[in-house]
């Protein structure tokens, strides 16, 4: 999404902004001080931060976002009280914390910082551009690419439901995600709400050979 334009509108209207950094955390720098309206940034841990599934981060930048815990009780610090503690971190930590997940996410973040988000992004963008060029030569495919995109590429196989295409790609050894990708309004805007798309995601460990393999696999996809 065009964050600059959205932030400008919300700043003028006095509306706080919560930014979804699901596809950008770990590959794009976000200057949180640049946007006065930015109140929080949320991101999953299992994507470009290389952490385990089931982890994530909600970065609250000020008191405009008063996050409430999903579950309460069992904090271990005020067991004699019937109410949830009102101080941090206890207010947000009910039950047994996901220590293995937190440790894994911390290790993933250390990896990203050691390699550099810019270096990871450059590697992924190179592979995305190569794959997009190869797929655009196939008239049966509609490729959704943009110069500023990160390591994610969406493709629609004309006349083939996204789920069918994904299943055939899986048979060829290519793991993709099919559907609306938690963004139905984006698909409505793109005109793919009814069919969905196939989404391919690259990482720092992806190789040019894998991109070539994916391009070849798309040639085999057909309507069942």
Question: Which sequence ranges carry the predicted segments?
Answer:
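Active-site PLP attachment segment
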Residues: 35-80
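PLP-dependent enzyme catalytic core of the Aspartate aminotransferase-like
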Residues: 171-175, 187-224
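Conserved PLP-binding catalytic core of the aspartate aminotransferase-like
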Residues: 125, 140-184, 188-190
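Structural signature of PLP-dependent enzymes
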Residues: 88-131, 224
